[in-house]
């Protein structure tokens, strides 16, 4: 009887822990990882730009109104359009058409609307007069008067949920088995989210006063140049995404070594009509629990981010300085995601799904309460540690908020995202496609828009309110939502065990 040598045993254990991908699987693993890298690369450039433009050009308070009254209706419309498209078009064509639409809109804003914003927007003095005359409606007036910024922000907000959460993961879930997912998904997260570090360094340079762009072109307005150069990069990377989708569709879906499902199973979801498919989804307790989890994250993180971003604007008031700080934050978020992905990979293998999935809501709740505590009890804390804190209260709030967001996003984009995607794998094709579209696109926006709705109601009723003044209320709501998220994770774990 042959015995396994100690060196071979150690090699197998090392591979299982750090590189559980077989050599013959690299033909599938590398293209999917590259696609995730490119989609997240664009996603994080857009994240930096949308916040820097909207908050610096208008205010932090307007973001909540934009999410409620602009982003959510567009997201709902997209789900309806997508359900129609999937019945008539291949995934490949859907990806091409949506990419062309979004990139065209971003180019139009960067090269036509933004440089000539005074032509397209209501004059600031006129807008200010209207807002002063109707104080309870001033934020709604600002939405309409600054429509260019709002449209750009809305489309940039939709990019992650359409291209990453929906299209990429639907594509990937179709290609991978449950057994492969346990080995691949955390590594996808590791390689894909490393793009945040590259984006951080890139955007820090593009937004700084000593940007490398000055060596090649003359800069008349640094903020417009920042947006135009960034948009050009986004367009190039989007083309690479389309080429990767083409390669995967042509060479991986047709290779029985990489793709193990029958063509008939892939087309099952396309035979049901729109109304019938949505009725099917509504009856699924499983999807409702998934919706609560996704919505809870969007709701909770948006409450913290809203207050934090208002503080950032006070410290960094211009588009470029805001973008430079945001780039540093994105960079460290990338580092946190990579570290937590390595941790999460081992947690998921060594423990059950619930242990891995519950890490995100617990960390977000603990760090969020600490941040709100600093904002609500700032004077008491500063007097208690008088002389020990070497930075201003504003700089301290921005720093603590940054740490909170880095830890929250780090756990969410590494551990929670991969845990959530495993929940879709055992589902049938209808729930896996149209059900995923409804949950992933709508739920995240419902979460953020519900949070924005709470904020918009307060700001409408109390026109002079600020995020600092309403922080005690937001803190209570935030804590309640985090507990609801933890409860939903526990319930869906029991449902997952029944079908996995």
Swiss-Prot record:
Pfam families: TLC. It is a multi-pass membrane protein. InterPro entries: ADP_ATP_car_bac_type. The chain crosses the membrane at residues 26-46, 62-82, 94-114, 149-169, 184-204, 224-244, 287-307, 328-348, 357-377, 381-401, 469-489. Keywords: ATP-binding, Cell membrane, Membrane, Nucleotide-binding, Transmembrane, Transmembrane helix, Transport. One of its GO terms (biological process) is nucleobase-containing compound transport. It comes from the Bacteria. It is found in: Cell membrane. GO terms for molecular function: ATP binding; ATP:ADP antiporter activity. One of its GO terms (cellular component) is plasma membrane. The keyword Transferase does not apply. Its main location: membrane. Provides the rickettsial cell with host ATP in exchange for rickettsial ADP. This is an obligate exchange system. This energy acquiring activity is an important component of rickettsial parasitism. Belongs to the ADP/ATP translocase tlc family. This is ADP,ATP carrier protein 5.
